[in-house]
Amino acid sequence: ELYPNLYRDETAVRLIDQIDYDFSVAEKNSRSLMQRFGALEVAMRQCDLAWEVRDYLKTHPCAAVVNLGCGLDNTGRACDNGSCKIYNLDFPDVIALRQQLLPAGEREQNIPCDLKDPA
């Protein structure tokens, strides 16, 4: 919400209202210069990543978008071109929460796994 002209994540805005969590401490901390700089850095990185994914999908429309350690990030869906497949991978408890809040779409899979497990 600090830099909506740079990157506006409507899903995150919706989830903040949906999740039973007191964000007041985070909001208070967001006033510091370091926190604002960190938020700017994250917004810029997210904007760049989304641009790269969309650009790649222009020339590879049926590609797979793989989001490792996805949490509640919705970049794959935000960049969806209508043809790609989206794979969101994270720990089982994270994927369980994701399934509740962001159920997988038609060409999307939420995959529970431990990315540190070499098996």
Predicted regions and their residues:
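Rossmann-like AdoMet
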Residues: 1-66, 70-113, 118
